Amino acid sequence: MDANKQKSLDLAMKQIDKAFGKGALMRLGDKEIMPIESISTGSLGLDLALGIGGIPQGRVVEIYGPESSGKTTLALQITAECQKAGGVCAFIDAEHALDVGYAKNLGVDVDNLLVSQPDYGEQALDIVETIARSGAIDLIVIDSVAALTPKSEIEGEMSDQNVGVQARLMSKALRKLTGILHKMNCTVIFINQIRMKIGMMGYGSPETTTGGNALKFYASVRIDVRRIASLKQGESQIGNRVKAKVIKNKVAPPFRQAEFDIMFGEGISKEGELVDYGVKLDIIDKSGAWFSYGETKLGQGRENVKAKFMEDKVLAHEIEEKIKAAMGLGDLMTMDSLDIEDVDL
């Protein structure tokens, strides 16, 4: 760049800094590019699938799927992991259905969890904006988009037509929120439901999510959660096998997926993942129905090994660290150390 252009640019940058604050416009090379920080999901496999060791901080994340597929459980598990790392979390319970006892079982520190049960959508999103602007919150969970009912719809008659009102509300809120979240390094998780497209014929998925298209565009990560099998002990159902697929990912390659167990009353079974990934990565030896770790016999059958890990936390932690090291989760994984296809269960 010639001297006159450089002088004009420097003058313009000074004017911008004076008008909008220092750093409003800067050269990319003037600032060190930091790796994207993440919050663990509580699932080793999903942390791997997301590519950075969890969901990105300072971004919008959407978790969606059919009813009873594990959406809220996953969001609460992320909340627990964030709190364990010293973060402050808020839960916007638009559905008025938060089970405090279940959240506690998942490891959520309910005494220090900020909770709001808003009366209508605008109130919920105003609360989100206010606490995000404070800079004191690390994670906000909104359960759910479908329950963010506009005030006009609540105060109107059942016969009133309110076409597109919620979509406009979401679009306006996300336009305001994205910049604030990035600046304050606050993550917002929107839990969403799916609906069937009316008159859908031919190619493409007949499913869509509620709240319009804005969330699809503004979300840095979208996770599709589906129940794929029931886990039984004898005749009793004790949990679900769940598949989580990363449909959109702006911070790592998308379309990776992970499977894990969600046990009723307990949440994501980390012990089950230790068994599955330990075997896949040759950290745990499997011979027939028997499992062993080095010279240590772990037990016969997957459920017995899970029970062993629940009893022996030191052993479980040792194996977990080895799995994380093999996956590359120890240093904000680059995905070069292990192909997701090698560990997709």
From Swiss-Prot:
Keyword annotations from UniProtKB, A to Z: ATP-binding, Cytoplasm, DNA damage, DNA recombination, DNA repair, DNA-binding, Nucleotide-binding, SOS response
Coiled coil spans: none
Biological processes, Gene Ontology terms: DNA recombination; DNA repair; SOS response
Gene Ontology CC entries for this record: cytosol
Main localization (coarse): cytoplasm
Compartment(s): Cytoplasm
Pfam family, one: RecA
Role according to the record: Can catalyze the hydrolysis of ATP in the presence of single-stranded DNA, the ATP-dependent uptake of single-stranded DNA by duplex DNA, and the ATP-dependent hybridization of homologous single-stranded DNAs. It interacts with LexA causing its activation and leading to its autocatalytic cleavage.
This protein's name: Protein RecA
Species, as recorded: Sulfurimonas denitrificans (strain ATCC 33889 / DSM 1251) (Thiomicrospira denitrificans (strain ATCC 33889 / DSM 1251))
